A protein has these predicted regions:
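Alpha-helical segment of the N-proximal tetratricopeptide repeat
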Residues: 13-43, 56, 60, 187-188, ...
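TPR-adjacent "capping" and linker segments in tetratricopeptide-repeat scaffold/adaptor proteins
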Residues: 7-16, 170-175, 246-247, 251, ...
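Helix-start (N-cap) detector for alpha-helical repeat units in TPR-like alpha-solenoids
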Residues: 14, 48-49, 82-83, 116-117, ...
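Structural marker of alpha-solenoid helical repeat scaffolds
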Residues: 43, 77, 111, 145, ...
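Structural signature of tandem alpha-helical TPR/SEL1-like repeats
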Residues: 26-35, 39, 60-73, 94-107, ...
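TPR/TPR-like (Sel1-like) alpha-helical repeat modules
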Residues: 142-146, 154-162, 173-176, 202-213, ...
């Protein structure tokens, strides 16, 4: 076979091989394209773009390690190339290495003009780290560039939902006796159609805002519904009093939906920049809730039969305690996207909570085939194994869960129970101390420490832990 000498390769020869590689790639012949690019980088080892293209081919074929090596070589030669940083970020995201994903994606963002994919993956990465404010910011930018991407819209809706819950928690914590806190509770009960509880909260809110006409209308309406009357919601919606329930009876669609989303986003930015008060925190929470709802409507409007639309329906059914309906919808998700993470887990977890262990196990195991690094699935499989007396298997699952999530208190408690039953008290103490470190406010660890110390004959230590337990139990929540 005739060997090609690197120095003898003409520009025309190189162009020909490049053309052949591109033709093979366009035809879907990834192996031939890969072989061509491998030849090119051997002959021109300083050609950064060829390494980047080779990395793309490895990535398309699921060869992540080879792709990473090619991308790193590309940016070593030419640091201003943005593409390799993006794909390194995507690979790191898939490997759950979120710090590396952020680092690479932010570098790609700095090197390239606004790009929907970079904003999307930055949003997904922030979301995976529970940095929901940052996630929403990136996903808003992605949605502005492409308002039809259901994955972007789904994660944006969920980010807004998490931010709403965080803001409601802040409202309750800092302004527990405020009329706005009471009003937020009324909205929660009304959304669940718990008319008696809703009317009671509206009554309490009206005591603090006795001159508010709309609040009085809401009280009378919920009282009528609590009494069984088929009363329609009277009056005109008030943005302050109705807030997150503004669209309960009439949902916007088409251009009006986009207009309302933009208006709510603008309103939210103003609220976040203003001074903090009970009213502002209430409005922030309610506006996040509105945005979560509107963005979910955008998912349904974009593709009502998409896997994300069915996933949102499943989650709504789960929140309303309709587990059977939720499972049906989760299975509809799997019909459309069998490899979507967290769906088998959602089904298995619903079965697990109801102690339907035979149905739960195969779902949780299926989740681990898709995502072996799912700490909660590992924990629940450990719990199933412990329940059936398979303590060695349970121990293995719990330890694997803790490798991924060292602060999982439930797994530490589960291991303590196994070790205590087996007389391995030092291991019991180790995991109780770790549970205490993970959540110092929980008195349970102190009580269980006292029991283990008592078994070891360390009565003074046991008395101390019981005293701490009693003190924490008596502390105001």
């Amino acid at each position: 076979m005739l060997a090609i000498v690197p120095g003898a390769l003409s520009q025309d020869d190189l162009a020909r091989i490049y053309s052949e590689a591109q033709q093979a790639q366009a035809a879907g012949d990834l192996q031939t394209a890969t072989n061509k690019y491998e030849a090119i980088v051997r002959l021109r080892p300083q050609m950064a773009e060829a390494y980047a293209n080779l990395g793309n081919l490895y990535y398309q074929q699921g060869q992540a390690d080879r792709a990473k090596a090619a991308y790193r070589k590309a940016i070593q030669i030419k640091p201003e190339l943005g593409g390799p940083y993006f794909f390194l970020g995507v690979i790191a995201f898939g490997e759950h290495d979120y710090p590396a994903a952020l680092r690479h994606l932010q570098r790609a963002q700095a090197l390239q003009p606004p790009n929907v994919l970079i904003h999307s993956y930055l949003g997904y990465t922030h979301y995976a780290r529970s940095a929901f404010r940052e996630a929403a910011g990136e996903l808003e930018k992605a949605a502005a560039l492409d308002g039809t991407d259901i994955d972007v819209l789904y994660h944006l809706s969920k980010s807004y939902g998490h931010l709403a819950r965080d803001s409601y928690a802040e409202l309750q914590s800092q302004f527990s006796d405020s009329a706005y806190t009471i009003l937020a509770r009324a909205h929660l009960h009304e959304s669940r159609e718990d008319w008696k509880a809703a009317s009671e909260q509206y009554r309490l809110a009206l005591e603090k805002m006795p001159d508010n006409r709309r609040l009085r209308e809401k009280l009378q309406w919920t009282q009528a519904r609590a009494a069984g009357a088929p009363a329609s919601n009277p009056g005109t919606n008030d943005e302050l009093i109705d807030a997150s329930l503004m669209y309960r009876d009439s949902s916007p669609s088409g251009p009006k939906l986009k207009e309302e989303m933009v208006r709510s986003q603008s309103k939210l930015r103003e609220l976040l920049q203003g001074a903090k008060s009970d009213k502002s925190v209430y409005l922030i929470a309610e506006t996040y809730q509105v945005l979560s709802f509107l963005t979910s409507l955008a998912v349904f409007e974009t593709d009502p039969d998409s896997y994300r639309a069915h996933q949102l329906r499943a989650q709504l059914l789960e929140e309303s305690k309709n587990d059977e309906g939720a499972i049906v919808e989760y299975r509809n998700v799997l019909k459309r996207k069998p490899d979507l993470q967290n769906i088998h887990f959602a089904i298995g977890s619903l079965y697990w909570k109801e102690q339907h262990f035979e149905e739960a196990r195969p779902e949780l195991e299926a989740e681990l085939k898709i995502n072996p690094n799912h700490p909660q699935a590992l924990y629940e499989l450990g719990d199933l194994s412990a329940f059936t007396g398979e303590t060695q298997i349970a121990e293995k699952y719990f330890l694997e869960a803790l490798k991924l999530e060292p602060g999982m208190v439930e797994a530490h408690f589960a291991l303590e129970k196994i070790y205590t039953q087996n007389g391995r008290f030092e291991k019991s103490l180790e995991h109780l101390q770790k549970a205490l470190h993970a959540n110092a406010s929980d008195p349970t660890a102190h009580y269980r420490l006292a029991l283990v110390y008592r078994k070891l004959g360390r009565n003074q230590d046991a008395d101390r832990e019981l005293a701490i337990f009693s003190q924490k139990q008596a502390a105001p929540k």
